[in-house]
Amino acid sequence: MNLCDIRDIKALLGRHGFHFSKSMGQNFLIEDWVPRDIAEASGADKNHAVLEIGPGIGPLTQQLCRRAAKVTAVELDKALYPVLAETMAGEDNFTLIPGDIMKLDIPALVDEHFEGLTPLVCANLPYNITTPVLTALVEAKRFEAITVMIQKEVALRIAARPGTGDYGAFSLFMQYHTEPEVLFDVPPECFLPAPKVTSAVLRCRVRKEPAVSPQCGEEFFFRTVRAAFAQRRKTLLNSLSSVFGGQLGKDTLAQIIERCGFDPTVRGERLGLSEFAALADELYKELHK
């Protein structure tokens, strides 16, 4: 059975009475090269255990099972369990975990299932859960790399550089923890049903240490980042005033920004990780005098 052949897919789904769920963002691959190239991009080999989220009917799962020592897939849709039981019947290194990835303890899952192996993530993520899932995976601090197919617009935002329209708070979060790289596009016609947008494969190599080490700590660092991007059209001074103005005052904030070497009228999107680290540290020092 070819899990990327439309006739085989329809016959398989028909046998199990499966119907696509719009609420779950289900789009199944119908081009063989896509799951093959995604699995290859993940870098999985016999030293790795792979966590897959939303395996669907299993085309990427099969490719991963051929490469990795172990593949553990989390699937929410109960209607797909009997489908996967059929398509993955011959894969001894495959484990299905029924459930919602956002409700699972990811570090505990990895520690239980991946002992002695290097954990990776490789998945075709539903568009509607991309940001919270990536956040949870990064914060789990368990994975060597995270390779996902997501909406191209989101992939570009994650990998965006300072001063570009795509750059924002989530760019900084992902780049603080990982080294993201957009690898290749996947057009809508590669899916059944076809989505309205182009997808892209993004690989994020997880940093052993964060890209910068703000003395103020991660929590305050990202509080500063979120404040700077809360209203993109505002200057950095006005954005920070909305959050810190009650404690520091606008004149003090302007002096802090200038001490960091920036014009108070600059927008937050112009600052990189190191600039935000310097700014957050100065704000923190002033607040804790």
What is the meaning of each model-derived region?
Residues 1-227, 258, 267-269, 278, ...:
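Catalytic cores of RNA-modifying enzymes
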Residues 227-289:
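C-terminal lobe and adjacent flexible extensions of AdoMet/dcAdoMet transferase-like proteins
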